[in-house]
Amino acid sequence: TNNSYSFKQDENIGRMQDDARHALREIAFDISMAGHYADLHIPSTVAYDGDLTIGQDCGPAGQINWMYQATEAGTGNSLSLMAIDNATNATVAAAHSCFIGGELLDGTDVVSIKRVAGAEAGALSANAAYLRTNGTVGVMFSGVAPTAPPVVVAAPRADWAFRPTIYYVRQFANAPGDNIPTLCRKALRAAGPGMTTECIATGIENLQVEYGIDTTEDGHPNVFLSNPTLTQMQTVVSARIFLVARTTDIDTRYTNNKTYSVSNAPDLVPGDSFHRRVFSTSVSIQNIRTMNMMGV
């Protein structure tokens, strides 16, 4: 009996660790790629095809094709990386229209990333969006080719799949009420194209991110902020990412009275029978750093 119990708990904890490491790799890679616009380098130079469309958008109410927008109207601030600190369902719904009520686990961070893929596209899909660029000018379009481009992208040129994502912790894994917190992301992979939900790892109970801001323009972080403004995010050069993971099954012989202190989230003293671990990593955000060093 004891051997069976030990095996079950080892398996439970091992699965939690594997899931958490996978989740950390996924979000760390996406954050490190924020602001990658292929050879174009500068998001503000992206132009938009006249027939660019999106099925399910995911921006503030009233803003059309927000997921495609590389910069903020009016300020010109880059939208490559955005943060909602210790979000609630109300704050995430105001910023991202594709979230449904009660989906987010309140008090966890939400991270929005805009970038293109790391390699040129092969065959183009009618249900995807692309950046066509020659390194001097670029056009964002949906479908297999731009039909009303505002600028001509002369050869040699390449097409790059547009890969925006929004990471968050969902309250449930498979259905509302199952109470299995899960790291998910909204991604531009639905028909239309449009935003859809992809879940990465179950048992992720909290996501916290601290952003390294370069205030002296030397390419290195001077301060780490958990709740940066969009203006401050223009000089982000790195990020520290924290995940709190728990087992999906309880351990009937265990009570978890540990205190978990992660970033600026309130301390957690669960008092339940789930095993937990904190996983963390740091990443450099080279694309935004390079733009800053270029004085863009």
Task: Report residues per predicted region.
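C-terminal juxtamembrane segment of a hydrophobic transmembrane alpha-helix
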Residues: 1-10
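Glycine-rich, histidine-containing beta strand-loop boundary motifs that form or position
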Residues: 3, 20, 35
